[in-house]
UniProtKB/Swiss-Prot annotation:
Signal peptide: none annotated. Its EC number is 2.7.4.25. The keyword Magnesium does not apply. This is Cytidylate kinase. GO terms for biological process: nucleobase-containing small molecule interconversion; pyrimidine nucleotide metabolic process. Transmembrane segments: none annotated. Disulfide bonds: none annotated. ATP binds at residues 10-18.
Length: 223
């Protein structure tokens, strides 16, 4: 079985990270959560009270405190800036509401995309984000474009937040997700869009395992 690159793109809370992790584990591939990288950059900007115009200061912070990944004893992904574990802080609502603005900064994307491409050279990889199939891994053997209704995605995020103890209002989440969809698909640099050769998959009404099986079937055709 040959190793391949699998690119999974889609809007916020479409289930990308959840299915990407499972697929990577099942195939023994590396999983790279690109969204966590942009969240880490956003967390650093907020913590240092930087506004989006302060690009040089943010790039300097990213150099001083490199983003890296690790594993907990239970096998869960950990996210670090420098040697500080920021796995949980980057999922807070404040970071979620600002990440689109930071991710739209061309210099930040350029820096992180370069790092993502470097990691992808190491072999079989599953990467999820907004521009993996179009910008980061345009040569990926399998590209998936995952979508789901705003209502369903808000429900998923609501349940995730409640499970993590993050106070959340469902109607507010719906508005935030719709607003983020607009920002992500209308930004000038690497907007969210389906790659021409991507497999379109609407996950509305499907459970995680059903989505995983559909993607794995597509992957196995290419191995």
């Amino acid at each position: 079985m040959k190793t391949i690159q699998i690119a999974i793109d889609g809007p916020a809370s479409s289930g990308k990270s959840t299915v990407a992790k499972i697929i990577a584990k099942d195939f023994g591939f590396t999983y790279l959560d690109t969204g966590a990288m942009y969240r880490a950059a956003t967390y650093m900007a907020l913590k240092n009270q930087l506004v989006v115009e302060e690009v040089e200061a943010l790039l300097a912070l990213l150099d001083q405190h490199p983003i890296s990944f690790g594993r907990s004893e239970t096998g869960d992904q950990l996210v670090f800036v420098g040697d500080v574990d920021i796995t949980h802080p980057i999922r807070e609502n404040e970071v979620t509401n600002h990440v689109s603005a930071i991710a739209a900064i061309p210099e930040v994307r350029e820096k992180l995309v370069s790092l993502q491409q470097e990691i992808a050279q190491q072999g079989g990889i599953v990467m999820d984000g907004r521009d993996i199939g179009t910008v980061v891994l345009p040569q990926a053997e399998l590209k998936i474009f995952l979508v789901a209704s705003v209502d369903e995605r808000a429900e998923r995020r609501y349940k995730e937040n409640i499970a993590k103890g993050i106070e959340t209002d469902l109607e507010t989440l719906k508005k935030e997700i719709a607003a983020r969809d607009y920002k992500d698909s209308h930004r000038e640099t690497s907007p969210l869009k389906q790659a021409e050769d991507a497999v379109y998959l609407d996950t509305t009404g499907l459970n995680i395992q059903e989505v995983v099986e559909k993607i794995k079937a597509e992957a196995e055709k290419r191995m």
